[in-house]
Amino acid sequence: MDAVQELEHRITELEIQSALQEDVIAGLNAMVAELRQTLDLQQAQLRLLYQKMQDRNPDAQEPYSLRDEIPPHY
């Protein structure tokens, strides 16, 4: 191979690597966006649960106890 062919080969290899990296980055970006949505949903659920706990007994001096949540079949 002469120098020009070697350079063309190297450029082709770099273009292939770049295309593969772009594909991986796009996949990772989609995954991060999905995880962000999941995190936002979980944070909203946690805020709702916290608000429900506060609404149940807003003036209580003692912490919330799971013993207050005995299932109805007991």
Swiss-Prot record:
Annotated TM spans: none
Matching HAMAP family: SlyX
Family: Belongs to the SlyX family.
Name of the protein described by the UniProt record: Protein SlyX homolog
Source organism per UniProt: Neisseria meningitidis serogroup C / serotype 2a (strain ATCC 700532 / DSM 15464 / FAM18)
Lineage: Bacteria, Pseudomonadati, Pseudomonadota, Betaproteobacteria, Neisseriales
